[in-house]
Amino acid sequence: YIQGYSGDVR
């Protein structure tokens, strides 16, 4: 997942 993404973090 992408840590620090706006809103949806997977």
Swiss-Prot record:
Q: Which domain of life is it from?
A: Eukaryota
Protein name in UniProt: Unknown protein 1
Tell me which species this is from: Capsicum chinense (Scotch bonnet)
